[in-house]
């Protein structure tokens, strides 16, 4: 199973016609055995305190899956290994350090137990939880892979003894993007009339989730290229969910159909939406209130060497998307994929350095758009981050700098494996 240490592979093939403009379910692996960055092997411990490693998954959705890889107990490096709860993720903890006796069954979260998958291997356990498309949860759940009671001594050549202690691996899953009363649920029925032109027309809005429920096995010719960065779930229990992107780059009028495999007949579906207007952002080519984005200013007209254009998105804001137009020198060159983020040091000498926005927000659930002809960049944040963050991109021309400062508000003011997805698909399609 060294494939778990392999790099990220994003593969999805369930429905014919899925193309690169679709975002597929994300996979998150908390690998406490094979990943050298977070393994729980005994290491040098001079403080006596337990060293904690782990991963936080913030609001997974639409068939995203989380996998825990935990070493099995043995007489060497994992002598006192303990997985808590022992049946994770079929049961879970609401506090990170409670005991097995405090575990809660998955059904208490109103997630069916079949969404939890377990597989034993010779030297490790694999536990997977699949996040359903519809849920009403406001909880943070935990599972532990605890090797902290394993202690060893390493004798060096000079006779010195070095104390080694295992680490505590912690999985934290935040589930608070719930839908109290799920909307946009459409029951799709078949039409048996030959040549039928009846259509199910669905009006779309930015960021909303559309749920298609149908009876029986189906296949589709889905091919809506106009909708870029739409996230789509694994079709489970005759339910297919689609999250619309944070922006529509053009008017949408897309038709596709579901073909009912067993009983015959088709269902025609039409998606419609208006192009997103008035995206908040900074246009550094024209005066404020004009141009592609309304909050910028013309660099040639500013009095100082630099000025800041601030944009707010996220919780409590009107939008989860922001734009930037800069046909000049842009830093980082691939804004927003890369951003300037203030690195804080204990001595107070803070400095802005280049980071991946994925790393700053601790999520891969981010939408990126770029129009080379217009020198226009757009970023969309469909999932509210765990923490509020501020990032920058700098547009420079003739000695003048326009600084776009993007403030992303939170709700609280990664290895992806084809093997894991294959396991999920094979198990769920047995039902």
From Swiss-Prot:
Alphabetic keyword roster: Cell membrane, Disulfide bond, Glycoprotein, GPI-anchor, Lipoprotein, Malaria, Membrane, Repeat, Signal
Membrane-protein topology: Lipid-anchor; GPI-anchor
Domain of life according to the entry: Eukaryota
Lipid-anchored residues (GPI-anchor amidated serine): 409
Glycosylation sites recorded in the entry for this protein: 45, 239
Xref: InterPro entries: 6_CYS_dom, 6_CYS_dom_sf
Principal location: other
GO cellular component: cell surface; plasma membrane; side of membrane
Record note on disruption phenotype: Strong reduction of female fertility, while males remain unaffected. Gametes are unable to either recognize or attach to each other.
Propeptide stretches in the record: 410-431
Limits of the 6-Cys domain: 26-178, 278-413
Signal peptide annotation: 1-20
Subcellular location: Cell surface; Cell membrane
Residue pairs linked by disulfide bridges in the UniProt entry: 30-55, 70-145, 88-143, 282-309, 326-395, 335-393
Matches recorded under Pfam families: s48_45 (PF07422)
Role played: Required for female fertility.
Protein name in the entry: Female gametocyte surface protein P47
């Amino acid at each position: 199973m060294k494939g778990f240490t392999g790099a990220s592979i994003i593969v999805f093939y369930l429905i014919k016609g899925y193309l690169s403009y679709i975002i597929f379910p994300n996979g998150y692996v908390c690998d406490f055995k094979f990943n050298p960055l977070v393994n729980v092997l005994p290491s040098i411990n001079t403080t006596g305190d337990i060293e904690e490693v782990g991963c936080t998954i913030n609001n997974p959705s639409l068939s995203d899956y989380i996998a825990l890889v935990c070493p099995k107990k043995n007489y060497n490096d994992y002598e006192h290994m303990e997985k808590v709860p022992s049946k994770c993720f079929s049961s879970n903890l609401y506090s990170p350090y409670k005991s097995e006796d405090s575990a809660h069954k998955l059904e208490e979260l109103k997630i069916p137990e079949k969404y939890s998958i377990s597989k034993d291997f010779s030297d490790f356990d694999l536990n997977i939880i699949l996040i359903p498309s519809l849920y009403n949860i406001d909880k943070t759940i935990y599972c532990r892979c605890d090797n902290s009671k394993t202690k060893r001594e390493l004798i060096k050549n000079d006779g010195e003894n070095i104390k080694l202690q295992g680490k505590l691996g912690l999985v934290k899953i935040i589930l608070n993007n719930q839908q109290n009363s799920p909307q946009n649920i459409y029951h799709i029925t078949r039409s048996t009339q030959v040549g039928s032109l009846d259509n199910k027309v669905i009006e779309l809005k930015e960021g909303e989730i559309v749920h298609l429920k149908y009876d029986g096995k189906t296949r589709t010719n889905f091919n809506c290229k106009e909708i870029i960065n739409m996230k789509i779930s694994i079709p489970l229990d005759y339910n297919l969910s689609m999250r619309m992107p944070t922006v529509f780059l053009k008017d949408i009028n897309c038709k596709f159909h579901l073909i009912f495999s067993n009983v015959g007949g088709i269902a025609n579906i039409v998606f419609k939406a208006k192009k997103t207007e008035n995206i908040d952002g900074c246009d550094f080519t024209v005066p404020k209130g004009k141009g592609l984005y309304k909050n910028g200013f013309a660099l040639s007209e500013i009095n100082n060497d630099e000025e800041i254009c601030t944009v707010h998105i996220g919780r409590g804001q009107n939008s989860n998307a922001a734009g930037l137009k800069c046909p000049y020198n842009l830093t980082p060159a691939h804004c927003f994929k890369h951003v300037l983020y203030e690195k804080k040091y204990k001595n107070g000498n803070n400095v802005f350095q280049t980071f991946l926005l994925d790393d700053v927000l601790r999520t891969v659930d981010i939408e990126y758009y770029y129009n080379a002809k217009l020198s226009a960049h757009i970023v969309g944040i469909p999932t509210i981050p765990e923490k509020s963050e501020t990032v920058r991109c700098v547009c420079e021309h003739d000695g003048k700098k326009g600084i776009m400062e993007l403030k992303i508000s939170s709700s609280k003011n990664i290895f992806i494996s084809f093997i894991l997805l294959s396991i999920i698909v094979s198990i769920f399609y047995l039902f």
